[in-house]
């Protein structure tokens, strides 16, 4: 946690973005409030929200409430005692995806360690409801590790998302400090078991940089992900949400991100997005497999007919 006396690194120019609050963005924000829905785009203060909502027709819904049972030191999502589950949430999410005419939707969730099934049944039902109402929209899920409950993971994977995304976030050495309620190896096992359950569904993970890791540790994390058959990798700059969160140790340059992407592709990832403003869901619509891309093309054709 940064104190008033600690030096805060000055944000470089390449992290300064121009906000584009066009009609799509404004309309989506209004609808979210009307439907009483949460998005991680807003809760986690994502820098790409205007591009995704405004231009790419993608959005990331955060289900199972807006309060997380964990308190990861990098994350801006509220923590504390969550509310009861809203059993109508799956239908509202599905309806909103339809009204927004989304090309790709990411469904993430707060960690619900207070629930016996970690929220997996409502999560899976949300995927099914979205699929029923939006057959041409590709669906990516971004769950917590569900406390290592692999029955919950099986429930989730049985809903057949187009991508399973679970973020390792940082290197092994820093994991206890960055996300104390998770473990590095449990994340790897979660990803491995996801692929074993549904081998044709691409798996994906994300690394934040700038927390004090070394380049060698980043490469080791890439190797660990590939050893567990992860297909897609995103790498982005950690940005400190508030003074209460971990402070930034280093700002990586766009050139350094380019080098990281090249190394990732050389290591065998099928797709890698790497850049200062890249987040886990950034350009996620481009990362689905060919079968899912065909679904998107059919949706575009129907939209333009």
UniProtKB/Swiss-Prot annotation:
Major enzyme class: transferase
Keywords assigned by UniProt, alphabetized: 4Fe-4S, Cytoplasm, Iron, Iron-sulfur, Metal-binding, S-adenosyl-L-methionine, Transferase
Parts of the chain that traverse the membrane: none
Entry superkingdom: Bacteria
SUPFAM superfamilies on file: Radical SAM enzymes
Keyword S-adenosyl-L-methionine belongs to the record: yes
GO cellular component: a single term: cytoplasm
Matches recorded under InterPro entries: Aldolase_TIM, Elp3/MiaA/NifB-like_rSAM, LIAS_N, Lipoyl_synth, rSAM
One GO MF term attached to the UniProt entry: metal ion binding
Ranges for domain Radical SAM core: 54-270
Subcellular localization: Cytoplasm
Chief location bin: cytoplasm
NCBIfam families: lipA (TIGR00510), PRK05481.1 (NF004019), PRK12928.1 (NF009544)
Protein name: Lipoyl synthase
